[in-house]
Amino acid sequence: MTQTRAVGITGTPGTGKKSVSRLLAPKLHRELLELNALAASQSVQDDFGELAVDVNALGRDIRGRRLSGAVVSGHLLADVLKASDVDFVAVLRCDPAVLKRRLSSRGYAHEKVLENVEAELIGVVLDAAVRRFGPSKVHEYDTSRTKPASVARKIELDLRSGLPQTAPWRDWTLGYDSSTRLRSLLSAPRTDPAST
């Protein structure tokens, strides 16, 4: 393997970045840098009680570390790294209905669940990665029904092969046979007294 720059792992929250990257880094004998952990140590709370990340400061911090050869994981990857920082970017994708169940089971607020499901449905993270790093560096992996170890192995094989992305990008909207199913996926449960 000739890669000397970083390998990026990104995706919408809940797609398996942490699990996959923690399995992949040792397979590749590379250091793992988790953007969320680094961001949490630098973040401040905004007026709404959410953590606000200074992506420019995070980018400087990550580049000040041993970025070369590392596996860098996080949904902010395209906001923090430059195209010249990476040789390969794995975008983890997940069927929005599966993602909704995953995030709900983790205790995410319903509003956050819907925000992330919508982002996955329309491919926000994939689009950002392709725009930032270029389509030849970006590879897409469906984690909906695949174990993290299998995803890590597939990424390892693709990385070692050196082949560019060849499959067309996934469009989750094609998997929903009606606008009713799409609306139901993106709607909040009714909480008014009439619904109980």
Predicted regions and their residues:
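Hydrophobic anchor at the beta1->P-loop junction of P-loop NTPases
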Residues: 9
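Walker A/P-loop
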Residues: 18
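ATP-dependent small-molecule kinase phosphotransfer cores
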Residues: 31-81, 168, 173-178
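ATP-binding Walker
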Residues: 15
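A glycine- and Lys/Arg-enriched "phosphate-lid" helix/loop adjacent to the NTP-binding pocket
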Residues: 93-139, 145, 160-163
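P-loop (Walker A) phosphate-binding loop of NTP-binding proteins
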Residues: 12
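NTP-dependent small-molecule kinase module
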Residues: 130-196
